[in-house]
């Protein structure tokens, strides 16, 4: 695979972050007024500037067929599996930033392909400064491309395996999912087209976006932390359908400087949607 890098520019409008707050304001406290982007809010910005989409409605430049130059590689679903965010410098709202996106690797695992994407958020510096760019934020995301239908049986954790406390409960609606897709300019059909989701990819309904669940987690846990989050590693374990009541939980085994959180199902104690390690 040839090295591939794309560059996107965007103005980080405070109107868009306020729109995200407004989406949740009746169920979650409004974030404190700040001039800076919160960790994870960059997901609302830097949409790819390509017109060509795959049949699932998402951009095709990152799929294995495009990256490996093999048009015979077909897939039924793409899944947002896991990722990492690292904050190096404050990111100021209503300023223009540059996003450098590159492919770290493409791996074939059995009949599936895994694509690891890295994004670096940069701010241009004055001409009289030796280094022309400051690295403000690093992101890694891992997508899986598969031909298998969506699992009807959720991955479950044994009850009592971990001790945790519930910080917040939140019920996600279908309109939350649709509205978030509009805010983040995400055209992926599994987030708005119920017929496609059911009859093509095999889900029971539309599903919540991976970035949305990361932002929801951050918004719920930050008030309980003494310092801003500087690093977050997460793994998605199950799909989140509309009208699911989520419990944002903190593991009681968290160590100094590192906290472990989960997004669980309120009604089904052994159903975990996300696990995340957070460093402050």
Swiss-Prot record:
InterPro entries found in the cross-reference section: HotDog_dom_sf (IPR029069), Htd2 (IPR026223), Mitochondrial_HTD2 (IPR052741)
Keywords: Lyase, Mitochondrion, NAD, Oxidoreductase
Taxonomic path: Eukaryota, Fungi, Dikarya, Ascomycota, Saccharomycotina
Organism: Saccharomyces cerevisiae (strain ATCC 204508 / S288c)
Compartments where located: Mitochondrion
Main location: mitochondrion
Protein name stated in the entry: Hydroxyacyl-thioester dehydratase type 2, mitochondrial
Similarity comment text for this entry: Belongs to the HTD2 family.
Note: Present with 799 molecules/cell in log phase SD medium.
PANTHER family, A to Z: HYDROXYACYL-THIOESTER DEHYDRATASE TYPE 2, MITOCHONDRIAL (PTHR28152:SF1)
Disulfide linkage: none
Record-listed E.C. numbers: 4.2.1.-
Coiled coil: none
Domain of life, source organism: Eukaryota
One biological process term in Gene Ontology: fatty acid biosynthetic process
Keyword Hydrolase: no
Function recorded in the entry: Mitochondrial 3-hydroxyacyl-thioester dehydratase involved in fatty acid biosynthesis. Required for respiratory growth and for normal mitochondrial morphology.
GO annotation, cellular component aspect: mitochondrion
GO MF terms, alphabetically ordered: (3R)-hydroxyacyl-[acyl-carrier-protein] dehydratase activity; oxidoreductase activity
């Amino acid at each position: 695979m040839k090295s591939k890098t794309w560059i996107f520019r965007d103005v980080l409008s405070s109107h868009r972050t306020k729109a995200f707050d407004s989406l949740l304001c009746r169920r979650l406290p409004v974030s404190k007024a700040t001039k800076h982007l919160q960790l994870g809010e960059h997901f609302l910005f830097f949409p790819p500037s390509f017109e060509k989409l795959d049949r699932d409605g998402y951009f095709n430049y990152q799929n294995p067929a495009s990256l490996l130059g093999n048009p015979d590689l077909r897939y039924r679903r793409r899944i947002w599996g896991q990722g990492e965010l690292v904050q190096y410098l404050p990111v100021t709202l209503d300023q223009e930033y540059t996003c450098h996106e590159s492919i770290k690797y493409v791996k074939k695992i059995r009949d599936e392909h895994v694509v690891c994407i890295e994004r670096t958020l940069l701010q241009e510096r004055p001409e009289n400064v030796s280094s022309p760019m400051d690295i403000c934020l690093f992101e890694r995301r891992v997508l899986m491309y598969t031909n298998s239908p969506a699992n009807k049986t959720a991955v479950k954790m044994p009850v009592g395996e971990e001790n945790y406390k519930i910080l917040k409960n939140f019920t996600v609606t279908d309109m939350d999912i649709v509205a978030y897709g509009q805010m983040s300019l995400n055209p992926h059909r599994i987030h708005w087209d119920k017929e496609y989701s059911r009859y093509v990819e095999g889900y029971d309904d539309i599903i919540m976006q991976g970035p949305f669940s990361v932002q929801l987690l951050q918004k719920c846990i930050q008030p309980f932390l003494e310092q801003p989050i500087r690093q977050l590693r997460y793994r998605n374990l199950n799909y989140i359908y509309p009208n699911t009541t989520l419990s944002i939980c903190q593991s009681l085994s968290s160590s100094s400087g590192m906290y472990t959180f989960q997004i669980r199902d309120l009604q089904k104690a052994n159903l975990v949607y996300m696990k995340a390690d957070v460093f402050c």
